[in-house]
């Protein structure tokens, strides 16, 4: 009997180390950043079973077999649609400013579609203004309303949006709504899904959280886009979720969330529509490509207006494009670079680009919230401050609430606005969308918004920063080590 238990013990030990060795080899064979690989290996060696389960659940980009198969079958029809759209030469920009040209060229070559011109663009900086404008557009819709958000939180003006959308569906407008399962959990537990479906709205719960399928698809892969499309002509996107900040996360201790949204009219709505259709088919299997363009009757064939490129990122989209785009924008800066983000955990390449910009004489400012709703990200962000301050980067800590705006402004001309945070999750994992605008008028509007943020912020003093307590430095470095996983 003792021999039997001895054999079992040795087999268990052998299996234990074989499992660790197998996962280690799997991590090493994957083409991933060295800091990320090292962080995962450390977790596995310190807490083997917990680390292995965590890695198999969250360490690799599993889209899921069903969605991956749909992504493969969707591309031919999408490619044909893009080819048809490219035949409408009058809507595409052929020239860009010097600072914007490299980024527009990158996006066109990687996505297969150029930036579109002739768009009317409005920057909305107030939640009330955004939601009231959205309600008006819904009430005036003629044919279709399509929405996608990470979070829809019932309460306040968000309820008025829901009521307007249900009224539109009842009068015959085709309405679709896609919300992330994890982000909009409060919505899906409310009466609204049933009420909306009864009114005729197609409601889809994207990337459903199912613990039984945890090893088949990453549960932390989220649909983070915020998109509204109306009549294939009006479009919204930006950092704002479908929430009224007076009712949202009031107990988080960070104040009201501060966001911006862009409202657009023109051909950019058509290009955004193809990405909405991609996400819808990925989730439901139903093909809803926008109407094929008929060039001679497009209502927005005109030379005036803003030139906009749309970047869609996430599984199934051009790999690393948003990361490449940010690097291209930073390296294009010659005079000034201003970036706002709620979560700052950059890649080594992006951090190096930002510091290099400051060291070559560019006026570089980063605006982040002083109080963050994510303790881990807040501490990890601080770990990058010393290097940036030493390089000459100005770091502003916003004190007027949780600054949730994601924006980049280069030389007052090139603007990036959308859903992408400057952290690993947005850069490498989640479904995101970003607008690239080549226009000094819009750049001036964005600069005014950023200057208002700076006026409500405190500038971090490099000398005072070096005097912070030792325990804070230790905590920062601890979270910095795990920053590739945040």
UniProtKB/Swiss-Prot annotation:
Residues 219-246, 399-426 form the PLD phosphodiesterase domain. The active site is at 224, 226, 231, 404, 406, 411. The keyword Membrane applies. This is Cardiolipin synthase A. It comes from Edwardsiella ictaluri (strain 93-146). Keywords: Cell inner membrane, Cell membrane, Lipid biosynthesis, Lipid metabolism, Membrane, Phospholipid biosynthesis, Phospholipid metabolism, Repeat, Transferase, Transmembrane, Transmembrane helix. GO terms for cellular component: plasma membrane. InterPro entries: Cardiolipin_synthase, CL_synthase_A, CLS_N, PLD-like_dom, PLipase_D/transphosphatidylase. The chain crosses the membrane at residues 3-23, 38-58. Catalyzes the reversible phosphatidyl group transfer from one phosphatidylglycerol molecule to another to form cardiolipin (CL) (diphosphatidylglycerol) and glycerol. It is a multi-pass membrane protein. HAMAP family: Cardiolipin_synth_ClsA. Belongs to the phospholipase D family. Cardiolipin synthase subfamily. ClsA sub-subfamily. It catalyses: 2 a 1,2-diacyl-sn-glycero-3-phospho-(1'-sn-glycerol) = a cardiolipin + glycerol. It is an enzyme of class 2 (transferase). The keyword Cell inner membrane applies. It is found in: Cell inner membrane.
């Amino acid at each position: 009997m003792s021999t039997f238990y001895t054999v079992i013990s040795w087999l268990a030990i052998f299996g234990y180390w074989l499992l660790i060795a197998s996962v280690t080899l799997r991590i090493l064979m994957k083409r991933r950043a060295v800091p990320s690989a090292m962080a995962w290996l450390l977790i596995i060696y310190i807490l083997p079973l917990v680390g292995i389960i965590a890695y198999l659940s969250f360490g690799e980009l599993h889209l899921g077999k069903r969605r991956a198969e749909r992504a493969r079958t969707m591309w031919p029809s999408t490619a044909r649609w893009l080819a048809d759209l490219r035949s409408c030469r009058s809507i595409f920009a052929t020239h860009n400013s010097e600072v914007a040209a490299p980024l527009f060229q990158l996006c066109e070559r990687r996505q297969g579609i150029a930036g579109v011109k002739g768009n009317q663009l409005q920057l909305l900086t107030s939640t009330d203004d955004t939601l009231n404008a959205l309600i008006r557009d819904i009430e005036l819709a003629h044919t279709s309303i399509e929405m996608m958000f990470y979070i829809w939180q019932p309460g306040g003006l968000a309820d008025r949006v829901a009521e307007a959308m249900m009224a539109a569906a009842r009068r015959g407008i085709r309405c679709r709504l896609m919300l992330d399962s994890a982000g909009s959990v409060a919505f899906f537990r409310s009466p609204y899904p049933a009420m909306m479906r009864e009114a005729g709205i197609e409601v889809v719960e994207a990337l459903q959280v199912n613990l039984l399928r945890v090893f088949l698809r990453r549960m932390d892969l989220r649909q983070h886009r915020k998109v509204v499309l109306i009549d294939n002509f009006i479009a919204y996107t930006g950092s704002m979720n479908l929430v009224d900040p007076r009712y949202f996360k009031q107990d988080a201790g960070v104040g009201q969330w501060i966001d911006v949204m862009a409202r657009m009219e023109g051909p950019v709505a058509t290009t955004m529509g193809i990405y909405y259709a991609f996400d819808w088919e990925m989730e439901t299997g139903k093909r809803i490509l926008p109407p094929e363009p008929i060039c001679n009757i497009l209502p927005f064939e005109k030379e005036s207006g803003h030139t906009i490129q749309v970047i869609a990122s996430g599984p199934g989209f051009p790999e690393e494009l948003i990361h490449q785009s940010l690097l291209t924008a930073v390296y294009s800066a010659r005079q000034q670079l201003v970036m706002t983000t709620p979560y700052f955990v950059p890649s080594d390449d992006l951090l190096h680009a930002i510091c290099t910009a400051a060291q070559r004489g560019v006026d570089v400012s980063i605006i982040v919230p002083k109080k963050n709703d994510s303790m881990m990200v807040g501490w990890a962000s601080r770990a990058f401050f010393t290097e940036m301050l030493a390089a000459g980067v100005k770091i502003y800590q916003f004190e007027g609430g949780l600054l949730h705006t994601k924006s980049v402004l280069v030389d007052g001309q090139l603007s990036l606005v959308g859903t992408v945070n400057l952290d690993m999750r947005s850069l490498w994992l989640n479904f995101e969308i970003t607008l690239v605008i080549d226009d000094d008028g819009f750049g001036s509007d964005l600069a005014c918004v950023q200057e208002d943020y700076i006026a409500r912020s405190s500038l971090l003093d490099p000398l005072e920063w070096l005097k912070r307590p030792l325990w804070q430095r230790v905590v920062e470095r601890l979270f910095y080590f795990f920053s590739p996983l945040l």
